[in-house]
């Protein structure tokens, strides 16, 4: 099993069970050590809020999912240097948010798993889709 960088949607699809969860299960079986920039948590909170507002999650479910996510990613969150993020955003044309994940993958020499096709098309050497 290797270490990989994952974005928030990969974490969300693993924990919020749905049609894409099976692919995330396979990914976790192959590469069980997941890391991410600290930004993942803010983005995950946003996913939970959105699901609550659409009625897809009850508040108590959100709390459980938050605990599960924090447990999954404990000691695996990195502070990203802002100038490095700017550099990657400039080089790739990706949003600063996405560039945090790309920068971390580049800096650690790891693959970034994401469901964002735009990121994959702009960074084919680093980013890939879980399948």
Report the location of each language-model feature.
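Active-site-proximal, substrate-binding regions of enzyme catalytic domains
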Residues: 45-73, 84
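Short, well-structured N-terminal submotif of metal-dependent ribonuclease cores
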Residues: 1-39, 51-60, 118
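Contiguous, function-dense segments enriched for cysteine-driven chemistry
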Residues: 10, 16-20, 34, 64, ...
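A cross-family signal for key residues in well-ordered alpha-helices
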Residues: 12, 48, 86, 103-106, ...
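Alpha-helix N-cap/helix-start and coil->helix boundary motif
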Residues: 41-45, 82-83, 119-120
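Active-site neighborhoods of divalent-metal-dependent phosphate/nucleic-acid chemistry enzymes
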Residues: 72-115
């Amino acid at each position: 099993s290797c270490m990989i960088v994952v974005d928030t949607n990969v974490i969300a699809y693993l924990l919020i069970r749905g049609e894409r969860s099976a692919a995330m299960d396979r990914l976790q079986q192959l590469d069980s050590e997941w890391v991410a920039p600290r930004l993942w948590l803010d983005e995950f909170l946003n996913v939970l809020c959105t699901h609550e507002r659409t009625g897809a999650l009850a508040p108590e479910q959100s709390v459980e999912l938050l605990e599960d996510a924090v447990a999954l990613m404990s000691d695996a969150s990195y502070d990203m240097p802002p100038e490095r993020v700017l550099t990657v955003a400039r080089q790739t044309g990706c949003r600063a948010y996405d560039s945090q994940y790309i920068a971390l993958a580049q800096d650690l020499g790891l693959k970034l798993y994401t469901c964002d096709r735009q990121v994959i098309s702009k960074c084919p050497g680093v980013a890939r889709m879980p399948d």
